[in-house]
From Swiss-Prot:
The keyword Repeat applies. TPR repeats lie at residues 193-226, 227-260. Pfam families: TPR_9, Transglut_core2. Keywords: Repeat, TPR repeat. This is UPF0162 protein XF_1494. Belongs to the UPF0162 family. SUPFAM superfamilies: TPR-like (SSF48452). It comes from Xylella fastidiosa (strain 9a5c). InterPro entries: SirB1_N, TPR-like_helical_dom_sf, TPR_rpt. The keyword Membrane does not apply.
Amino acid sequence: MVEQLLLPLWNSLATVDDETLPLMSTALLIARDEYPDLDANLYDTLVQSYVEYLRSEVEEISLWPLKMAAVNRYLFQKLGYSGNHDEYYDPRNSYLNQVFERRLGNPISLAVIQIEVARRLGIPLDGVSFPGHFLVRLPVDDGILVMDPFNGGRPLDAEELRERVRPHLGGEVPDDRALAQILNPAPHRTILVRILRNLHSVYANTNRWDRAARCADRILKLVPNQPEALRDRGLAYLQLGHRSGARNDLTRYLQLYPSTHNVDMVRGHLVDLSNERIQTH
């Protein structure tokens, strides 16, 4: 009997340890919100077929970087997975089932596939929540090898990494210690939240507030009382006319994050909501 891939339950995720939170399964759970008929077993079987194709070649290689090079050749050259440079903000780039089907994705979704295949082959690949552009990292004898899944798994040296991160640090070039901290492995929860934040951004920027609210709500399932997600869900509820939900979320946001830079904006919305409430009584 073929073992079935069981997706986790949203209400259970907050209490799951980061070490045991399944990355690909939870990414597929995110996709199931948009594609309710998604067959998770189909994609689990697909990944396993990649692993079986690569297994004998990878087992004959002794060095991690060369093992990973074989994985990258297969995924990005033979199978044709690639970054969607032309339609970067297409939400399908974040939904893992669509990335498998179209072999197009954004940096983080391609990284999830890369990590899943590598880990099943015993390769200790991790994600890196790099500013602006998600990356992956592999331990090597003299440090780490950092790769760009959006561009075929291309290795990146320290100089290029510093140049990439500099605009996100106000033009400052990080020293070795600061760069090492930026390149720390990302826990699965962090990766999944970033997928959802990407989707929220796409939907909010295109005024699809029901989906924006859903993405913020899912972040709160992963990280209860996460301040930015409370704010984002509250603002989405406001656009949807869910006044009580908006008031509750925005009030809680200010309780958790009283020094936020957008405190005046949030307080303004709460004043408007209070005035509306008074006028209706």
